[in-house]
């Protein structure tokens, strides 16, 4: 197994407090008095800011809506897992034997959480400037030809992957109606999961409306996940 020093070298940052790094790499399954959940919570907020800043500087002509969509395509489990893979983070996480046997080192969720926690740990030790340097460098390495088009996600596919993983079900899209003249029609679509409406949106085509509804639904799912994490952490501290 590679040393922590090798990981730090790839990361481009050497921790003064190694215990902080070890905590960031420790999954809750490892059964220690500590795990990386609190650092993950902090890192999530830090990454939201520095990735937003990266896009703001990279695309001076992009409007707020475009920047928000691009950030949503990077600030998520899949995006963070890609950055984690870039520094071979999976080799260094501390997990239980059960997780090891279940290929836990390759799971996007574990990689994403540990990456968030590691960024939270760097922030605690040195502040925002070093996190910014590390993350901006990794983004340039992972997305060398980043542009507006390449960052817009297929939200329908992303939502389907999420709902199949969580519920074993695929989303259903319902056309609620259309308005406007034939040359400038607008369609309204609702996306339903397990029979319940999660979001609705409008677009100049059915496909565009479905993509926007899927994007909103993804935001709702991610917000609920974040709120659940915050609630769980609050419960543990009380």
Swiss-Prot record:
Top-tier EC class: hydrolase
DRBM domain sequence ranges: 154-223
UniProt keyword annotations, A-Z: Cytoplasm, Endonuclease, Hydrolase, Magnesium, Metal-binding, mRNA processing, Nuclease, RNA-binding, rRNA processing, rRNA-binding, tRNA processing
UniProt binding sites for Mg(2+): 40, 113, 116
Subcellular location: Cytoplasm
Superkingdom assignment: Bacteria
Cofactor(s) annotated in UniProt: Mg(2+)
NCBIfam families recorded: RNaseIII
Subunit structure, as described in the record: Homodimer.
Recorded family membership: Belongs to the ribonuclease III family.
Protein name per UniProt: Ribonuclease 3
Gene of this entry: rnc
């Amino acid at each position: 197994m590679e040393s922590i020093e090798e990981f730090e070298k790839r990361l481009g940052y050497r921790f003064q407090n190694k215990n902080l790094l070890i905590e960031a790499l420790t999954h809750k399954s490892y059964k220690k008095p500590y795990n990386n959940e609190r650092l993950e919570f902090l890192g999530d907020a830090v990454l939201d800011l520095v990735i937003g800043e990266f896009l703001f500087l990279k695309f001076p002509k992009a409007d707020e809506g475009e920047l928000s969509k691009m950030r949503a395509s990077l600030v998520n489990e899949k995006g963070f897992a890609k950055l984690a893979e870039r520094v071979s983070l999976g080799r260094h996480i501390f997990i239980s034997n059960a997780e090891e046997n279940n290929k836990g080192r390759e799971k996007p969720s574990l990689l994403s959480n540990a990456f968030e926690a590691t960024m939270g740990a760097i922030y605690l030790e040195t502040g925002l400037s070093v996190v910014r340097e590390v993350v901006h460098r990794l983004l340039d390495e992972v997305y060398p030809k980043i542009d507006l088009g390449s960052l817009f996600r297929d939200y329908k596919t992303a939502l389907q992957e999420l709902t199949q993983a969580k519920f074993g079900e695929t989303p259903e899209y319902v056309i609620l109606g259309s308005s406007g003249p034939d040359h400038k029609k607008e369609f309204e679509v609702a996306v339903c999961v397990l029979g319940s409406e999660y979001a609705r949106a409008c677009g100049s085509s059915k496909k565009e409306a479905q993509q926007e509804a899927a994007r909103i639904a993804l935001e709702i799912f991610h917000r609920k996940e974040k709120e659940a994490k915050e609630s769980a952490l609050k419960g543990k501290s009380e």
